[in-house]
Amino acid sequence: MFSSKKSLLLFKNVRYMSTSSSKTVGFIGLGNMGGHQAINLIKKGHNLIVFDMSKDNMNRLKEKGAKIANSPAEVAKEADVIVTMLPASAHVKNVYCGENGIFQTVRPGTLLLDSSTIDPATAREVASIAKKHQSTMLDCPVSGGTGGAEAGTLTFMVGGSEQDFNTAKTYLECMGKNIVHCGDVGTGQVAKVCNNLVLGISMIAVSEAMNLGVKQGMDPKKLAGIFNTSSARCWTSELYNPCPGVIETSPASRGYTGGFGSALMTKDLGLAVDSAKSIGEPLLLGNSAHQLYTLLVAKGDGQKDFSVVYDFLNKNFKNSN
């Protein structure tokens, strides 16, 4: 006879062996990132059932062919695979563990892929609860911004076993280009926290340098061009420049609307600060970056793209000459 552990493994494998097109994929969290990810899953032929707090967001997916659910629990009743893209740890806990949450109705063998950016401890905690419900959860945070989400070129940083990672790739490759196995559950979030620490600091550095050059008479496009062909070259300068007019398609050129909100960057830098404290590591630039973005949020720029730090520096520190 099979042991209960072997029986569960066999059951999971039988579910995973069926063709992906026959599976129902649930998607919860249809904001600036998740909405595009869900659409790309539909484009790749997957049947979707979706939930979001915004009816407008759900209706946009309904127009693309998705089925609408009334709660995360309703999604879990029907889905073989569930992807979540939520703002913070508290939202993840509520969607999975709360009233009408996923764990109320999740079926044994369900694959759970959380693309939210949260602290590694919460990722491990919720994955442990998922295991008690005979389902498998991987942390799969992303990088690439709304442009990458729309184009299907996101980088996924995945924490989980090698076997579960290989299963998840079938779905993640519908939404991204670079799918990286980081290690055990929680390491995807570790990688994402470190990535966004660099992103936040580099945005401040590029903004400060652009502001310094422009206020001394440099043409912003020429200055950015020098950065992008010299040792200052980085993603922030080359593809997401914070100075209006340098890149016509960037949030900076449309009043810092859309993109990745300053409030979310503040949250992510806070995760880095907390992570460093938990292991007794100093975070000199990270702490300063977190304080600056906290100030931006306090002055009302939380919903503006995080490149608005350039606008803050430009307007608040006038050239005294």
UniProtKB/Swiss-Prot annotation:
Cross-referenced InterPro entries: 6-PGluconate_DH-like_C_sf, 6PGD_dom2, 6PGDH_NADP-bd, HIBADH, HIBADH-like_NADP-bd, HIBADH-related, NAD(P)-bd_dom_sf
Residues the record lists as binding NAD(+): 23-52, 86-87, 117, 267
Keyword hit for Transit peptide: yes
Pathway: Amino-acid degradation; L-valine degradation
Protein's cellular compartments: Mitochondrion
Full protein name: Probable 3-hydroxyisobutyrate dehydrogenase, mitochondrial
Disulphide connectivity of cysteines: none
Catalytic machinery residues: 192
Assigned EC number: 1.1.1.31
Gene Ontology cellular-component annotations: mitochondrion
A GO molecular-function descriptor: 3-hydroxyisobutyrate dehydrogenase activity
Reactions catalysed according to its record: 3-hydroxy-2-methylpropanoate + NAD(+) = 2-methyl-3-oxopropanoate + NADH + H(+)
Broad EC category: oxidoreductase
Protein family according to the UniProt entry: Belongs to the HIBADH-related family. 3-hydroxyisobutyrate dehydrogenase subfamily.
Any one GO biological process: valine catabolic process
Species of origin: Dictyostelium discoideum (Social amoeba)
